[in-house]
UniProtKB/Swiss-Prot annotation:
Gene3D superfamilies the record matches: Jelly Rolls
Keyword annotations: Apoplast, Disulfide bond, Glycoprotein, Manganese, Metal-binding, Secreted, Signal
Entry annotated with the keyword Disulfide bond: yes
Species classification: Eukaryota, Viridiplantae, Streptophyta, Embryophyta, Tracheophyta
MF GO annotations: manganese ion binding
N-terminal signal peptide: 1-24
InterPro entries in the record: Cupin_1, Germin, Germin_Mn-BS, RmlC-like_jellyroll, RmlC_Cupin_sf
Family indicated by similarity: Belongs to the germin family.
Protein name: Germin-like protein subfamily 1 member 7
Length: 229
């Protein structure tokens, strides 16, 4: 029961905090709602067509399952469960989404960015080392902190950031993002697993690596195995 109450409190806090992001990046809505629908006869707004309001139901604003732990048996030892406009059509134009992140001991949400959203994260279970790196203009400074249950950390929009479980038990965090569809670019996957591949000579010079090391990394990532989202 205590764990369930912590889950409810964390979810309520995130929704309250994330609501402040609604107008920070996505365009503000000009109607009560615009429930997304795959219908070419609908009205095109913010990347999604709008369902006719008279056909909107409560289910358009609902999803379930965030109480269920994600499968962390993968190469990075973590799992991200997304609740965005693809899961809740009613999020369309509302500028907010939510994720649950599960970590095995030693697992990580590897360095990545959200090009369209600021992220605010709260730890529910376990111990996480989190951080983000600033832009070139700020000399790529690292801001990092160890978080415990109840701790909250913000990752500014577009900054490369990460989370790592530094505890001996599983860890769980929830994060609110200031976009209905924040997008995710995992740095290693994008650089070494792009389709088609970036020329190894380019990456070898950029990362100051032997070209054969780059070819090895590209072979590992381009296989598209166990991609992390």
């Amino acid at each position: 029961m205590e764990g369930f109450l912590r889950f409810l409190v964390a979810k309520a806090i995130l929704l309250a905090l994330a609501s402040s992001f609604v107008s920070c990046y996505d365009p503000s809505p000009l109607q009560d709602f615009c429930v997304a629908v795959d219908d070419a006869s609908g009205v095109f707004v913010n990347g999604k067509f709008c369902k006719d309001p008279k056909y909107v139901k409560a289910e358009d604003f609902f999803t379930s399952g965030l109480n269920i732990a994600g499968n962390t048996i993968n190469r990075v030892g973590s799992n991200v469960t997304n609740v965005n406009v693809d899961k809740i059509p009613g999020l369309n134009t509302l500028g907010v989404s939510l994720v649950r992140i599960d970590f095995a001991p030693g697992g990580q949400n590897p360095p990545h960015t959200h090009p369209r959203a600021t992220e605010i994260l709260v730890v529910v279970e376990g111990t996480l080392l989190v951080g983000f790196v600033t832009s070139n203009q700020d000399n790529n400074r690292l801001f990092s902190k160890v978080l415990y249950p109840g701790d909250v950390f913000v990752f500014p929009i577009g900054m490369i950031h990460f989370q790592v479980n530094v505890g001996r038990t599983n860890a769980v965090a929830f994060a609110g993002l200031g976009s209905q569809n924040p997008g995710t670019i995992t740095i290693a996957d994008a650089v070494f697993g792009s389709k088609p591949s970036i020329m190894p000579e380019i990456l070898a010079k950029a990362f100051q690596l032997d070209v054969n090391v780059v070819k090895y990394l590209e072979a590992r990532f381009s296989s598209n195995y166990d991609r992390h989202y």
